[in-house]
Amino acid sequence: MLADTLKSIAGQRLVDTDGEVTHLELLPPATDQQIRDLEAKLPGLLPDEIRAALAVTTGFANGPLESFALLDLEGFGLDEAFPYPYSIAHDGFGNYWILDVLPGATDWGPVFYACHDPAVIAYQASSIEQFVKDIVAAPPDDARSPINHVHETVVHALWSNHSALVDQRIAAASPDVTLREFAEYLPPDAVIADLRDPRPGSGFAWGMYGPRTNIQRFGTHRLWALTRPPAKPGFFARLFGR
């Protein structure tokens, strides 16, 4: 359980890659008002596991990452990809670790790393509990750290290699009913990212066609279509109103 893991790491001795020693401190538990405010923002019920964890702490007072919190850090955009994103950690450089909270969900895993440079979404961990364990397992800038591996290796691999994406034509002929239904509504130049069963190394370059990449999600399924943005008219076309 997440609550038990949080209790077990309180006061844990952490040594960074420069040899500096700190001891992990937890923030106080959530107040009743904080719980009510949180529940008012959610698309569904607050999972029992998260409620129990919030009775232990709302996050880390210090620690390897810039921040880790069980109360949504907010600040993350990309609503077309994640209608109900829940930010639980931040690296201090505009990148977040988020949960894809779905209406009616009783389990808030997995954790995704949402990076803006490169513009990639990457699978990080199967659950918040595993993510917490990974945070304290090794300094985030240590090559052995699962956090470092995604932060420094996986995102660049996903940015340069799009072989896991499915062409619309192939998806439209797939025996997978959900994938096929999604493809039927997409233009032929679309490619689809499928993170319904994410594994280490999974993800997609949400900005593969630049900052104006068109992102379309298939309901609450973890399926996203990426297409090129409409071409901007050239100078003479704008000049003569073409």
Each model region followed by its residue ranges:
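Compact, glycine/acidic-enriched structural inserts
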Residues: 109-146
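A surface-exposed partner-binding patch
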Residues: 1-106, 110, 160-242
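Charged, low-complexity intrinsically disordered regions
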Residues: 156-158
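Charged, amphipathic alpha-helical linkers/stalks
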Residues: 152-153
